[in-house]
Amino acid sequence: MLDLKKLRSNTEEVKKALSNRGEDFDVNVIDEVIALDEERRKILVDVEALKKQRNEVSAEIPKRKKAGEDVTEVMAEMREIGDKIKADDAKVAELNDKINYIMLRIPNIPNPAVPEGETDEDNVEIKRWGEPTKFNFEPKAHWDLGTDLDLLDFERGGKIAGSRFTVYKGMGARLERSIINYFLDKHTFENGYTEVLPPYMVNRDSMTGTGQLPKFEEDAFKVENNGYFLIPTAEVPVTNMYRNETLEGDKLPIKHAAYSACFRAEAGSAGRDTRGLIRQHQFNKVELVKFCKPEQSYEELDKLVQDAESVLQGLGLPYRIVRICKGDLGFTAALKYDIEVWMPSYNRYVEISSCSNFEDFQARRANIKYKNSPKEKPQFVHTLNGSGVAIGRTVAAILENYQQEDGSVVIPEALKEYMRCDLLK
């Protein structure tokens, strides 16, 4: 959520920054919310004047009674003032609801470093690590390798739950688990994160706090009759651990790494990478979440990207980093980098991690603040998160990049102690 004061004082600047945001967003709603706020502020001034008048009249009543004067008219005036205050309070509450409705739907303001552009074609590549894997044979896709090696069962996943669900079997299940453990060990022992194992279901307030609601409700799996949502990412429960809290400034930055299953309806994504493990309704991920002071956040974003890179480098998987353009930025981010791993069957790089700085956008929604001393006025923290990284896509990348001509797959060196084998065959 944006700062309403900033909307009032820098209206045209904000409207310009939010133009071409790629969110089907009409910047004219900013004028609407400012008009509603002006109306609310005017009524609040009137209410304060009425309360002052009521206090003055109330103070006169005992004096008049003591003097033996009739207070009937004064009492009637008191009731009339009270009715006006009640009506104005109701109007303010109505305006608050309207303002909040709009504010929750206004996207974050892009950082000046965000490239101009409308689609992912306009994202800017800033780094490559490793070279795309070359083969002297025709490489297989990960879904064929997974089936041939009896690691993945897409057919039974579909029978159990429907399309875009997968059963991991035998060494496939062990590979998934090994990657999870490797990522968590890397981030906690080497990169300085504190591990969290969060709930997989959250309430509406939590989904609103991180920005999934109200805009993306159709992409979420909702549990009927009780208001719970299955989490689309561990970012939601981990960020909301500190909702409505004031953190100690000297404890920042706080860094958490969390493994979780993730659940996404992916409405409207039919036909886009729906074969194999790339776009599933349920998948595993290790998420990195940070809370820091505003002046720390962009340095922490750079470190976050490096931490996500470290696990891919450890696995020897070639990747590139792109800076996301304005039209592809997403609702909550101020600046975002995607890390894309090389997938031979696609002959292109495929997203495996997104790392974002939300500045105080989520903190305002979730009311997460900090202060450096007990007497200091609390300020909103900056929040960041990144995939550290998606597990299923890592499985796919390993199968495709480490495959051999005979159909076997070499285990990356970093995973051998977890897998207790050198080769999948």
Swiss-Prot record:
* Keyword tags: Aminoacyl-tRNA synthetase, ATP-binding, Cytoplasm, Ligase, Nucleotide-binding, Protein biosynthesis
Name the chemical reaction catalysed here: tRNA(Ser) + L-serine + ATP = L-seryl-tRNA(Ser) + AMP + diphosphate + H(+); tRNA(Sec) + L-serine + ATP = L-seryl-tRNA(Sec) + AMP + diphosphate + H(+)
* E.C. code: 6.1.1.11
EC main group:
ligase
- Positions bound to L-serine: T233, A234, E235, E287, S387
What domain of life does the native source organism fall in? Answer: Bacteria
Q: Please give the CDD domains that the UniProt record associates with this protein.
A: SerRS_core (cd00770)
Q: Return the protein name.
A: Serine--tRNA ligase
Its lineage opens with: Bacteria, Bacillati, Bacillota, Clostridia, Eubacteriales
